[in-house]
Amino acid sequence: MRPVTDLQRRVFPFEVISDFTPSGDQPDAIAQLTARLQAGEKDIVLLGATGTGKSATTAWLIEQVQRPTLVMAPNKTLAAQLATEFRELLPNNAVEYFVSYYDYYQPEAYVPSSDTYIEKDSSINDEVERLRHSATNSLLTRRDVVVVASVSCIYGLGTPQEYVDRMVRLRVGMQIERDDLLRQFVGMQYTRNDLSFQRGTFRVRGDTVEIIPVYEELALRIEFFGDEVEAIHTLHPLTGDVVRAEEEMYLFPATHYVAGPERMERAIAGIEVELEDRLAELEGGGRLLEAQRLRMRTTYDIEMMRQIGTCSGIENYSRHIDGREPGSPPHTLLDYFPEDFMLVIDESHQTVPQIGAMYEGDSSRKRTLVEHGFRLPSAMDNRPLRWEEFLERIGQTVYLSATPGPYELGQSDGVVEQVIRPTGLVDPEIVVKPTKGQIDDLLAEINARAERDERVLVTTLTKKMSEDLTDYLLERGVRVRYLHSEVDTLRRVELLRELRTGVFDVLVGINLLREGLDLPEVSLVAILDADKEGFLRSGTSLIQTIGRAARNVSGQVHMYADSVTPSMALAIEETNRRREKQVAYNTERGIDPEPLRKRIGDITELLAREDIDTKELLAGGYRQAGSKAPVPRKAGGDGSMRERLAGAATADLAELIQELTDQMHVAAGELQFEVAARLRDEISDLKKELRQMSAASA
């Protein structure tokens, strides 16, 4: 159910603004994709090699077709990167970011073998929640919208029609009593707070009402003259400075799960009927413990809903609140899009299997809760979409991947290729070498690269082999580090930066060297045990690993193997095919491959930035993703943390901890998770220091 008839969406053109123009394979890929979409093809695959500019191609495609677009990514990090790229390419359009708003999430679960019940525990990121509301607000009010989302967009989001029905439309000159408007705000789950003015609250001063919508950072001022809306202004909530005057505004509810008193009463009646039936079933089967457990929990939840309109875990009653039939699919972000939206699935070889697996992973946990009396059977309908339900809700789809999976290849009538890089870089040369003497050969290759100030990645099959190889190379004087699953996210980022800057020359890892590493300084990728068939040595994994050497003019891949497996043959054949095409293109046009120049500070430069200037926010209207969060100087930049703290008084240390804690929350709110993680670690170290100082003075 898409509420497309209830609102008139504003129409603005999609427009790419960039210093670059399509080059390499991009013009042909854009033309083919556009033609096939306009011809009505439902599934199209863009086979784009690493570094060919698939994101830019997607932006130019959106500009060509002029349709609202959902871009799905396999994880939050990649979604954030894509959102930033699209915001740079489409600065005048609404580029939104929609991912799970949990910083931390422990779902409710029950382990029968140990009779252990685990309560739901979570920490919600307010800024991500704002961005989710901003996405639905944009989708319902304008057409020039690109939403970059993780797979969480197929989870229940509340009924879009109820969301629209509860919306308030404000227009200069309209007639409405002030108190009626305030009651509508309360019904939309906004809270009156005349002292602390923040997102999701409103305040009243005579004939002036001010409110901060949950999806905005700026406030809205509504000025009355009697019962007439005299003026509407957008203003800065802190300074009160007016940003612009408005003629008309849509104000949406403070929650996607909005329900009026009548709907809630109907829901409670349905819950009570279901509870009675389920209790009779459990007691009839002699399961008195489960029946008592369910009775206590559900009657408590019902009482909470009657008294305050909500309860812990209210999403488990969403079927009753939405008025859906048993087994029917939930409403999701997809229902907020217009009918003609386009879907782009990035890294489709990863994302498509994720979409298909979400339902079963969720239902197996809930099934246990229902079976043992922790939840009513209707809780099973608080779930993500099944695969077939997902397919029913999407239209034309473009799959992006360097290694498309079997599903998308089977759905598409041939692929659109994009293998020529704008920089002229070609895929690396692949050399297959015997395993006998492989370590000595690898050592010689490493030394040769180190002399040329180039870097090396080595991928192994097991943790023990990685550790042993790292120890061996260290003994031989090689500057080497080991990247493994126990290294936290921030340290992983630092290791990659140190590799690029030349702090060390070799990075050894297992499965951490596939997607997502952009390392132009790496000229050699060594794959040990390349002939051991399996997940880590599949054709897809090998092609992705080979791509790590595709950013360097002299990139090479050495596969150590005693035989050529089908997966190796596939990866070698595909890489050579791309390489031949790239070399021929360069030769024909006289192009010399250019080294990829990427600033090394890209990943960690946030560690040295200062506080946000409030005037920037006012001038820019609202902060874009990627704005600067206040962070401390990077540890080590002017001495270690311990040196900086030498001689500090206990009070000073406590003040510093509080300051860093505030900065950590701001960084998390700005989605700078690596920065927040670093601050968290520094705070932990400081607290240990404070405890030691307190103990010494006691």
UniProtKB/Swiss-Prot annotation:
PROSITE patterns: HELICASE_ATP_BIND_1, HELICASE_CTER, UVR. Its main location: cytoplasm. One of its GO terms (cellular component) is cytoplasm. Residues 35-210 form the Helicase ATP-binding domain. It is found in: Cytoplasm. A motif (Beta-hairpin) lies at residues 101-124. One of its GO terms (biological process) is SOS response. ATP binds at residues 48-55. Disulfide bonds: none annotated. GO terms for molecular function: ATP binding; ATP hydrolysis activity; DNA binding; excinuclease ABC activity; helicase activity. Gene3D superfamilies: P-loop containing nucleotide triphosphate hydrolases (3.40.50.300), UVR domain (4.10.860.10). The UvrABC repair system catalyzes the recognition and processing of DNA lesions. A damage recognition complex composed of 2 UvrA and 2 UvrB subunits scans DNA for abnormalities. Upon binding of the UvrA(2)B(2) complex to a putative damaged site, the DNA wraps around one UvrB monomer. DNA wrap is dependent on ATP binding by UvrB and probably causes local melting of the DNA helix, facilitating insertion of UvrB beta-hairpin between the DNA strands. Then UvrB probes one DNA strand for the presence of a lesion. The beta-hairpin motif is involved in DNA binding. This is UvrABC system protein B. It comes from Beutenbergia cavernae (strain ATCC BAA-8 / DSM 12333 / CCUG 43141 / JCM 11478 / NBRC 16432 / NCIMB 13614 / HKI 0122). The lineage of its organism: Bacteria, Bacillati, Actinomycetota, Actinomycetes, Micrococcales.
